[in-house]
Amino acid sequence: MKRTTILMAAFLCLFSLTESPAQNTHKNMELLNLTQEWDKTFPKSDKVNHSKVTFVNRYGITLAADLYAPKTIFGGKLPAIAVSGPFGAVKEQSSGLYAQTLAERGFLTIAFDPSFTGESGGQPRSVASPDINTEDFSAAVDYLATRPDVDAERIGIIGICGW
């Protein structure tokens, strides 16, 4: 009886020290090597501030994004748009151009690389998964909704070709 109690207590202690995958999401967040210089296929706008951001989808994959914000903001929170390109494309191409152009028109935007693509994480590389890419959009909207400069009631998405 005493031995059973000790074994049960040891098991419970061990079990309580482990974490579920959901609890461990941010500890296992991939460290991405993000390019800081302008590396787009289009010219940089002088009307927009640009920065790199990352966020994690529900599969624990870290996504890389370019954030574009208008330099001139007329008070209040901004409407926001998440943009991603055709399957296999990266944010330095058309989705970045769309995002920058929309930021020039007053939106806060992010252009992101889907899972397994570009600067985003995930294995195997260079594959497209419509189910996971849909989750990537959901994670992008969730990320935008947490920003203090975004109106969470006015967030949209644009999927270019293939979406």
Residue positions per predicted region:
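Conserved alpha/beta-hydrolase
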Residues: 101-121
